[in-house]
Amino acid sequence: MKNFIVLFFIASCLIAVTCSKEKKSERFKLLTTPVWATDSLLANGVDASGPGGILEKFKGDAKFKEDGTGTFGKYEGDWRFNSEETEITIITDSLPIPIICKIVLLTIQDLKVTASVQNPANLQEILNLRLTFKAK
């Protein structure tokens, strides 16, 4: 009888630990499942993905990995959601400050984010960025 009680206790603990693991949200799955190909990269409404453009190095594929790391065009770094999963913060050693992006659209096929950042060429100017991606 003692063995049964001990086994029951151990099984209950294992079930409790397994069930208490945080499940991944739908938005987390939508963001981390595909590889995202850039569709448009705009700064103040103008294409900024060409040679010399402010977003040139973001051009290409973006992959948000489940472990919080990722690639964003030519950049590598970390990413995280805010608590409401309405913003993504991208942190990379290649940029002087983290970029906080507001999620405008996130579906199985489309990702659209916006951000406001200082223009590195003129710190008095704010650039309004809009980055759109399509799932590969």
PLM region spans:
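Lipid interaction determinants
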Residues: 19-78, 84-136
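Bacterial Sec-dependent N-terminal signal peptides
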Residues: 1-29
